[in-house]
A protein has these predicted regions:
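Conserved serine/cysteine hydrolase catalytic core
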Residues: 152-208, 217
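Flexible "cap/lid" loop of the alpha/beta hydrolase fold
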Residues: 78, 83-120
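The conserved beta1-alpha1 loop
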Residues: 2-4, 66, 191
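Gly/Ala-rich beta-loop-alpha elbow adjacent to hydrolase catalytic centers
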Residues: 65, 69, 73
Length: 245
């Protein structure tokens, strides 16, 4: 299980509980998150996270990823399909897929994330984190978030823009190489009905390319669906996982 940015492996506990009778699960902390060391920039962030995930795999595995974790799971499946029995992508923020089908989105999203990047560059991490979470957070106003959560978001906000080339520009060639189109792993795509409009376009773009991919939408949920609506996510995952034997 690969969690989203600005969280930690424990964020997947609710979803894990809903699948505990079906799977034996392992979750790890992304670089710069939880108990993992800081990301030092020597290796691209997504590449480093894929390599971390690979260290846990010794055979075909049911891979589950949320948000940035979903992009990691997708890349791993494309690189090592022999190690993936099934793939569950919950709101994978692989913007490059949406840009490929909707070129105008690149400029729109670039302007939005440009404001975040500009704030980071100016040393204003609070503004950067506030702007980012306004679109991609749990729906709470910045001022209403617990102080500890706001502080952690400010500490980690640079990791959001650090992955830009891999998830936005497809610098690893996951899409442009045709690896996504060749993927034959059973795949389930999950989105929240109230998520940013990019998510539906990303999921649709990926589902169109991955043979046999199944798409599900969770009513009343936003981008944090894997956390906020864990029982509902588990409920749609269970028949998919059962079908894998």
């Amino acid at each position: 299980m690969i969690h989203c940015s600005m969280a930690h492996s424990g964020a997947m506990a609710g979803l894990a509980a809903g699948l505990a009778d079906m799977l034996s699960m392992t979750a790890f902390d992304l670089p710069g998150h939880g108990r993992s060391g800081d990301w030092d920039g020597s290796v691209p962030l997504q590449r480093q996270t894929v390599d971390m995930a690979l260290d846990f795999l010794d055979g075909p595995t049911d891979l589950i990823g949320h948000s940035f974790g979903g992009t990691v799971a997708l890349r791993l499946a494309c690189e090592r399909p022999d190690l993936v029995r099934s793939l569950t992508l919950i709101e994978p923020v692989f913007f490059a897929a949406a840009y490929a089908d909707h070129p105008g989105l690149l400029e729109q999203h670039g302007a939005e994330m440009g404001a975040v990047a500009d704030a980071i560059e100016a040393g204003d991490r609070e503004t950067a984190a506030r702007l980012f979470l306004r679109e991609w957070g749990n729906g709470m106003r910045w001022a209403d978030l617990p102080e500890q959560m706001r502080q952690k978001a400010m500490e980690q906000i640079h990791l959001i823009t650090a992955a830009h080339d891999e998830i936005g520009l497809d610098s690893a060639g996951v899409l442009s190489s045709g690896a996504v189109d060749r993927l034959k792993v059973p795949t389930l795509m999950i989105a929240g009905a109230n998520s940013p409009h990019y998510v539906e376009k990303i999921n649709t773009a990926l589902a169109r390319r991955i043979d046999g991919a199944i798409s599900e939408v969770i009513d009343g949920a936003g981008h944090m669906v894997a956390i906020s609506h864990a029982p509902q996510v588990a409920a749609v995952m269970r028949p998919f996982l059962a079908a894998q034997g």
